[in-house]
Amino acid sequence: MTFDQSNFKSLIRPVVDFPKPGVVFRDITPLFQSPKATRQVIDSFVQRYIDAEFSHIGVMDARGFLIGSVVAYQLNKPLVLFRKQGKLPADVLSEAYQTEYGEAYLEVHADSLCEGDSVVMFDDLIATGGTLIAAANLIRRMGAEVYEAAAIIDLPELGGSKRLNDLKIPTFCLTEFALDEQ
């Protein structure tokens, strides 16, 4: 199946001034309304990681769950859930971080990873990088390492990919948008 970048990008809806004025939200729900586009996304990630040497897939609450869980299934990898504060029932590790919207906390079950584990992290997009950096900090606190951060969309003008790369976390995104791109 050929990856059609322009058609793919047309399925990501820009929503101006959401969730607050001045933000252009990249809505991926139309992408998931197209089985062909969804398959292209999943297949692209599966092909990237099928021969890679890592042990777990970490998914960010909530849109990272959509892609990462299917990729984990396809690659037969354990899934680690990184959730918003207060959503996990057992002992957790917590990490504060800044988003483009304000401060938040990311949590993970404290027994999710062990020393020597290696994790590909999945989210829907990389904006400021705050969520993925918080997840990387949690991964490292458990003695594991980050293999790569993966997302559907990169918003390079917000600096998240650069911040991740500066922290020696490689990134992989299927597409990118300029902030003013419609």
Curated annotation (Swiss-Prot):
InterPro entries: Ade_phspho_trans, Adenine_PRTase, PRibTrfase_dom, PRTase-like. It comes from the Bacteria. Catalyzes a salvage reaction resulting in the formation of AMP, that is energically less costly than de novo synthesis. Pathway: Purine metabolism; AMP biosynthesis via salvage pathway; AMP from adenine: step 1/1. Transmembrane segments: none annotated. This is Adenine phosphoribosyltransferase. The keyword Transferase applies.
